Amino acid sequence: MKSKEPKEFVSSLNIIRDNIEKLSKVFPDTVKDGAVDVTSLLHHLGLTNDHDEEEFYNFTWKGKKEAIQSTQEPSEGTLRKVKNYGDKTTKNLFIEGDNFEVIKILQKSYQEKIKLIYIDPPYNTGKDFVYKDNYKDNIKNYLETTTQKDKKSKLSSANIDTTGRFHTNWLNMMYPRLSISRNLLKADGVIAIHIDEHEYANLEKIMNELYGENNRLGTIVWDKRNPKGDSKGIAYQHESILLYCKDIHEFKKKNAFKRVKENAGKIIAKANELVKTKGLSMARKELKAWMRKQDFSGGEKAYQLIDEKGKVYRPVSMAWPNKKQAPDDYFIPLVHPVTKKACPIPARGWRNPPATMERLLKDDLILFGADETTQPNRKYLLEENMFENVSSMIYYGGSDDAKLKELDVSFDTPKVVDVCKKIIEPICQPHDIVLDFFAGSATTAHAVLELNQGNQKQLNFIMVQIPEPIAKKHEAYKKGYQLISDVGIDRVNKVQQKIRKEDPENADKMDLGFTVFKISSSNIKSWSQNEDDSISITPQNLNEHCTEEDIIYEILLQRGLDLTLPIKEETIKGKKVFNVGDGLLYINSMNS
């Protein structure tokens, strides 16, 4: 049966229609014949037209209306497979194309499937680039530019302060991308964005508007320990990383949001070594001396004591933490094990109920003083407290020059892998997907691969990078890279090869592969859908030069199916068909 609306099939998710459907589920009577009854909606929200003339707090700029409208226009592009690297069954993707269009194209297939969006966008310093969107036909504009039909056109341009629209240009680039990418996040998903002082204030306002202030997780300050040399005022030596979750209630329900104490293993190993070689008494003194010399966090430095069993611990108060007094049974005295006399009780009572106190006594987790005059503390063993709250500070003054040199990859000012890992690790669980649509040299993918190697997180990544030409003066160009996306693809491939070589045992358990796609105009003019829900496409319905593989991936995108599903060629009743996802979808071959 031929579709009466072939155009609908060759576009991405219709966001306006999707939003209207969501609205109709909440307020059914506000949607009539597919249109929104604004008056009815205002009544449901407790608003009347009298409010129109009232003054509201609003963050706006020239072009904001067009930026919002651009998010509601579906893309008429698709993705075309270019090459597979490594594991054929990989779930990792590297997509070459304008990230705005790519995010639109992924709306159906990856809606609410991404756990972390992690981006490092242009900071708008006046030297970096800002993407130039053509809201009327962004796909046509992109393809004309990348095929150099107009050699004078550019994918992006330096956003210099003399344009008179310095902040406006940046806002018009960022707002629509941040808006539609939110749809891809899981309910408990998180977005993390690197930024410096140039646009921090504006980014915060955008994020509060799109995500809501109540969903803000906070700002992490990355202290680079190296002040900027070109500053005209205060010399900044830090960047900021803003974190917002999609739904704070879902996030808290499903995420502990704790990070591994980075140096806990070192502390335990040092204590074990000292006890073994110096004895318990000397080990206690030397551990404290050693800890004072280390650049550890405050939470880690608190663990500098060794108990009779050789275990590292810290003392913690057992006093009731609230201003109000604890219940009556929280005032039962603890008896000193030597003097057999009652120890002092905290003024507002103990922190724990009697049953917990009994268990702590039994497990030797209460610390008594020399006699009954000292109030007891609780013993926190380091081995049982290997996680800590995520700090608002990251101290890292190094670079990845050595890592990139080892891989023989060149790129100016990449993110630092170890910093990326500190952001990704406390947020993501096994099998989560990390999306970076300002991929650059693919540092985020590099960090994901190292996390997978180190703790078998089994994370997957989707990298998106516009094929921006590299200037001939740069070292990367001299090494043979013509596009920024070339650098990212080569880097990911080399990191995976390195892991295979250095860690063959774990390599077999990891997803060491990725598939490269690039953005393209649609292959399909019209389509036919059979009664059995399979799809038939005839050569007459196709654009020139497309392959069966191109058609299959476009159908997956239109059906909202994962691009990494297995595809097998089969023969059914003498006809060649493609079995997608082990029977999830059958596509008739156009050569049958």
Give the predicted meaning of each segment.
Residues 450-592:
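PRPP-dependent phosphoribosyltransferase catalytic core
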Residues 61, 133-141, 171, 198-200, ...:
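Conserved S-adenosyl-L-methionine
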Residues 228-301, 525-526, 531-533:
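Flexible, glycine-/basic-rich loop-and-beta segments that form/coincide
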